[in-house]
């Protein structure tokens, strides 16, 4: 917030959440606000606008997309399976746990919209975002362990299909149509992540249980192999950071080192490890007033 004021305070009015919520801006006005139902949950809308008298109208075509002329082309990097040494459980065992959970809840389906949970469940990763190895996807799993995986099919390789033999792959654009074809069933959805769009579709002909996605708890319990790999990752990164600090101490007064060149040097040290894939976040590099 401090940096926002310094950089943009003259051009924009900076409002800090939670000191002031978006709904507070409109005060007592009775307005109708359009929103993209794919990008919001009804829970998030209520949280940000709970004190307002606004009405919300879903707009099913994103208006920003209509005027975005130079849109970034999405990458086509393939999804990939994690090696056996990187996981503590095969995906079939994880699916068994979900099946038992659904039977306990007397439910037919779990609809998973959090991509990181899909990655954990199937022991896969992707490169759909710059700093997090998640595959943008949805999963529909029933109590009988049948799995429908919705994604960009161009990112599904033959090796991925071989490794996930019991998973049925569908184009992500067909997800809504398939959900609309299901009737008189009981769904578990997490309204912290399931969009207004999908919740409305499911709720049309089915009963919904709003519960936390059970995968959050399951993946929080780390296995022995996962714990070992976490420790190794910290050691690998610690070695790179130690080399960088030694270099910085040696060259601090000899070279003109900027915030940018410093972060680039640290990245070079990290890349010397053959197991390095990419950063988990941009290096926070600051000096002087920053």
State what each model feature region is.
Residues 1-271, 281:
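A composition/biophysics-driven feature that prefers long, compositionally simple stretches
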Residues 285-290:
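Short, structured beta-strand/loop micro-motifs enriched in basic residues and often containing a Trp
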Residues 274-277:
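Short secondary-structure junctions
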């Amino acid at each position: 917030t401090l940096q926002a004021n310094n950089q943009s305070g003259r051009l924009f009015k900076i409002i800090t959440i939670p000191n002031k919520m978006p709904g507070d801006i409109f005060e007592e006005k009775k307005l109708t606000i359009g929103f993209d139902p794919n990008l919001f949950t009804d829970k998030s809308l209520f949280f940000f606008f709970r004190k307002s008298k606004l009405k919300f109208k879903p707009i099913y075509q994103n208006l920003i997309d209509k005027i975005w002329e130079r849109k970034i082309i999405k990458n086509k990097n393939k999804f990939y399976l994690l090696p056996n040494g990187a996981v503590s459980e095969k995906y079939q065992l994880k699916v068994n746990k979900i099946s038992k959970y659904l039977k306990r809840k007397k439910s037919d389906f779990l609809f998973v919209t959090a991509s990181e949970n899909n990655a954990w469940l199937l022991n896969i990763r992707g490169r759909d975002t710059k700093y997090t190895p998640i595959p943008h996807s949805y999963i529909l799993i029933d109590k009988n362990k049948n799995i429908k995986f919705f994604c960009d099919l161009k990112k599904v390789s033959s090796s991925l299909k071989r490794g996930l033999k019991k998973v049925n792959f569908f184009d992500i654009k067909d997800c809504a149509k398939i959900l609309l074809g299901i009737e008189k069933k009981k769904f578990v959805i997490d309204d912290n992540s399931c969009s207004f769009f999908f919740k409305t579709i499911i709720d049309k002909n089915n009963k919904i249980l709003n519960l936390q996605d059970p995968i959050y708890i399951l993946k929080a319990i780390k296995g022995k192999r996962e714990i070992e790999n976490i420790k190794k990752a910290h050691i690998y990164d610690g070695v790179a950071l130690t080399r960088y600090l030694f270099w910085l101490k040696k060259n601090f007064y000899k070279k003109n080192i900027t915030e940018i060149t410093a972060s680039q040097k640290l990245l070079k040290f990290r890349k010397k490890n053959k197991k390095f894939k990419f950063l988990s976040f941009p290096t926070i590099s600051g000096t002087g007033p920053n």
